[in-house]
Design a protein with these regions (language model features):
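Non-transmembrane, aqueous-exposed alpha-helical and coiled segments at domain scale
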Residues: 1-216
Length: 216
């Protein structure tokens, strides 16, 4: 069964690096002016008390080490793996924010517990298409077991919830927690209680500023 790769070349590149046959950007004269010492740059910024945000890609369970193998990507995508990618040690990290969608989606093959039919997903407004592949995403209700394990694997200290407005349309564009409906607040509170982790950032729409920020 095909895994459903994006076909972007990342897997072959990671494979070549593991085999130590990959040429790096620094090996090409045309790219040499664009190459910097990323670990030095990032650690220097941290030492200077600058704010540094490191954003990872993909979902926890696409991790090569901790995901639903073999239906995974070609590297580790957990918080520890992301830090290793840019060259910072674990003691340099203050906060780990894990991002959950208000429901679960998956592109391509692989397990998806309590998966909805495409028809039911469309009725709920959960019909989505992958930004890279253009393939339709499969959907399921929020999975507390997956979320709990993601919290553990990433050492999360905060939770960000996206697409709350898809579940609760009355919350679209809201920027204050007090403006959210009681049903939406109950949904957020249940996540906090079940996962014992605060929900600090809530997405309420597609716009950059469609966000409820509960951080001090």
């Amino acid at each position: 069964e095909k895994i459903g790769s994006t076909g972007s070349g990342t897997g072959p590149a990671n494979s070549d690096r593991a085999m130590r046959v990959l040429k790096l950007a620094k090996d090409f004269d045309s790219l040499s002016s664009l190459v910097v010492d990323v670990p030095l740059e990032i650690n220097s910024a941290i030492s200077a008390n600058e704010n540094v945000l490191i954003e990872g890609t993909q979902g926890t369970f696409l991790s090569l080490w901790h995901g639903t193998y073999p239906f995974v990507t070609s590297k580790d995508v957990t918080a520890s793996g992301i830090c290793a990618d840019v060259g910072i040690g674990p003691t340099k990290v203050d906060e780990v924010i894990v991002v959950f969608k208000s429901y679960v989606t998956r592109v391509g093959t692989g397990p998806l517990d309590k998966e909805l039919s495409l028809e039911d997903a469309e009725k709920k407004g959960w019909s989505e298409f992958g930004t890279v592949t253009g393939r339709q995403r499969r959907a399921a209700d929020f999975d507390f077991d997956l979320a709990r394990r993601a919290i553990m694997l990433n050492g999360a200290t905060q939770i960000s919830i996206t697409k709350l407005d898809v579940l609760f349309s009355e919350c679209e564009g809201k920027t204050s927690y007090d403006e959210l409906s009681e049903d939406a607040k109950a949904f957020v509170k249940n996540i906090e209680d079940e996962l014992n982790t605060p929900v600090t950032i809530i997405g309420t729409g597609p716009g950059v500023y469609d966000v409820v920020d509960r951080r001090n």
